[in-house]
Amino acid sequence: MARKIKIFDTTLRDGEQTPGVSLTVEEKIEIAKQLARLNVDVIEAGFPISSPGEFEAVKRIAREVRGPTIAALARAVKKDIDAAGEALKDAESKRIHTFIATSLIHMKYKLRKTPEEVKKMAVEAVEYATKYTDDIEFSAEDATRSDWNFLVEVYEAVIDAGATTINVPDTVGYTTPEEFYELIRYLKRNITNLNGVTISVHCHNDLGLAVANSLSAVRAGADQVEVTVNGIGERAGNAALEEVVVALDVRKDFYNVETGINLGEIARTSKLVARLTGIEVPPNKAVVGANAFAHESGIHQDGVLKERTTYEIIDPRKLGFSGSKIVLGKHSGRHAFRKKLEEMGYRLSEEEINRLFAKFKEIADRKKGLTELDIEAIVQEELGKGKGKYSVEVLHVISGKISTATVRVQGDGIDKIESAWSSNGPIDALFAAINRALGIDCKLKEYRVSSVTSGRDALGEVLVRVEYNGEIYVGRGLSTDIIEASAQAYLSALNRIRR
């Protein structure tokens, strides 16, 4: 039978300590209600003594949010514990979380107290907290830089005083998975009164190991993991909730544990926290980043389209996302391109697909990530222009008071003729050079440029109307380069002329 791992979410307390983040009371309540839908076991709602606003937020969450246990943080000081107890009084299920540092560096320089004085303060704090609740968590701040024997002493003393959860924080993100595993095992072997007491871990990400350390602790026997949504928090952040719970779910065969988290709410929770905190999720962020289930490599796309599990270890729909994302770019293959065209409703011949794929590859080399609008524009432009009698290559265009364009034209009996022309503007020079190469006298009646897609590397569409022998001919061109699009449009119009 799988062992239950409690998920203690501290997004509203440690997460809000992210530099630049400040949530209103209403925003905290909104996040707390979403965390309840996610089905976390404990919500650490805040640090009530720190400000009137923080006290009010904890009080409102305690009153309005049902399901999870609501926790409030307090130093090992009576006034902090009183504030926490008062803020939590309306909670359906409440916990006071008190802490004091136990490492030599903290005791000497921050607290200026001896180990015995620190242990006494810890015990008195836990005893005092029992007047408000019988669910008390004690944290030995900076545990991973503390003497292991002293940790055992302190934890045994606070358990005797009434602590029901002992937390082992890696406060400065100092430990490694192997060392943390050994520490948790050591505590489990040496704390003599641990029966029925929850061992919790709280990992910071200063060395990028918060999730790995948390998972290592679970394997060593920890019962509770403290996390934040999107991994936000002090400095480099905390262990990310979504990464920890998804790892435990995907590797249930290895860890043999379950969290009870409603995985279908992961995406919604991540987006809500990102929006309200203003901390964007990096695109390459595990589990919830925009690229977490995106595939651009042709080999990967081909595999995913044939069988999703070839390159995905979890179905994104299980986490509340719409599905995998095939990103069309310069690494994409013909299979993914064909699939995208079919999804867009196009049923094309092999010859048409080959033409479109060649154009797609040409544009993809210059544009990062083609959108559906880009693909639509390529289809309309390529299939609308026909094969054409002539093709043009723009060799170079020099702009200035006098602009010069040099082109190479071939086709319909013309073998790569180069032509140059100077004029008042680059487009005039370009069209005149093409006319000269083809020996044709056309008059430009209309020239129009529009952006087909968005972004700095957007596709631009050029429309031209030219007059030849009293008839009007229309041409269109599409490219990330307006000069090139203009040349394509002009040739498109000339290819319609019957001579």
Curated annotation (Swiss-Prot):
It is found in: Cytoplasm. Mn(2+) binds at residues 14, 202, 204, 238. GO terms for biological process: L-leucine biosynthetic process. Residues 391-499 are annotated as: Regulatory domain. Pathway: Amino-acid biosynthesis; L-leucine biosynthesis; L-leucine from 3-methyl-2-oxobutanoate: step 1/4. The keyword Thylakoid does not apply. GO terms for molecular function: 2-isopropylmalate synthase activity; acetyl-CoA C-acetyltransferase activity; manganese ion binding. Its EC number is 2.3.3.13. PROSITE patterns: AIPM_HOMOCIT_SYNTH_1, AIPM_HOMOCIT_SYNTH_2, PYR_CT. It comes from the Archaea. It is an enzyme of class 2 (transferase). Its cofactor is Mn(2+). It catalyses: 3-methyl-2-oxobutanoate + acetyl-CoA + H2O = (2S)-2-isopropylmalate + CoA + H(+). InterPro entries: 2-IPM_HCS-like (IPR050073), 2-isopropylmalate_synth_dimer (IPR013709), AIPM/Hcit_synth_CS (IPR002034), Aldolase_TIM (IPR013785), LeuA/HCS_post-cat (IPR054691), LeuA_allosteric_dom_sf (IPR036230), LeuA_bact_synth (IPR005671), PYR_CT (IPR000891). GO terms for cellular component: cytoplasm. The keyword Lipid metabolism does not apply. Keywords: Amino-acid biosynthesis, Branched-chain amino acid biosynthesis, Cytoplasm, Leucine biosynthesis, Manganese, Metal-binding, Transferase. Residues 5-267 form the Pyruvate carboxyltransferase domain. Catalyzes the condensation of the acetyl group of acetyl-CoA with 3-methyl-2-oxobutanoate (2-ketoisovalerate) to form 3-carboxy-3-hydroxy-4-methylpentanoate (2-isopropylmalate). Belongs to the alpha-IPM synthase/homocitrate synthase family. LeuA type 1 subfamily. HAMAP family: LeuA_type1. This is 2-isopropylmalate synthase. The gene is leuA.
